[in-house]
């Protein structure tokens, strides 16, 4: 800042260069590694109709050869647009849950896991936004990365 000794540094995760840029990929990296380690062939996750987390999950699963099933809060629109369109283009299977029924979406996720298992698949469940003890490692890694950046740039 002009005339000040204060420095403001910004880590621009959205500029990492792909359609899955941004902070969502940090947590997803660890969640999907866990899914692969467990031998899963399908990933189930949930979010809103325009969820960035769901978009990233669908695209990365497509690249990894994993099936993805999204549970989305909202009614199916006539024409998908935005992230929802990208979900479809990435090959996601989508179940829509009306907002008034959203409280039961965790039960639906468990039912889907059982359905996939009965069909011979193994499904890994990622909570909304990969906000769990596995996804947390993405931000632990980010803080280590920032420390290295500070050391290098100071």
Feature-to-residue mapping (PLM):
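PLP-dependent amino-acid enzyme catalytic core
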Residues: 1-154
């Amino acid at each position: 800042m002009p005339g000040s000794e204060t420095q403001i540094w910004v880590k621009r995760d959205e500029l990492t260069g792909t359609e899955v840029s941004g902070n969502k990929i940090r947590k997803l990296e660890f969640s999907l590694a866990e899914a692969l380690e467990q031998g899963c062939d399908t990933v189930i996750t949930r979010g809103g109709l325009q969820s960035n987390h769901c978009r990233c999950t669908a695209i990365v699963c497509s690249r990894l050869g994993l099936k993805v099933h999204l549970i989305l809060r909202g009614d199916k629109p006539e024409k998908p647009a935005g992230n929802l369109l990208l979900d479809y283009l990435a090959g996601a299977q989508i179940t829509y849950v009306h907002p008034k029924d959203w409280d039961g979406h965790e039960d639906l996720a468990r039912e889907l896991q059982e359905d996939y298992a009965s069909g011979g698949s193994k499904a890994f469940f990622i909570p909304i936004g990969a906000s769990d003890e596995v996804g947390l490692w993405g931000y632990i890694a980010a803080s280590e990365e920032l420390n290295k950046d500070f050391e290098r740039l100071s």
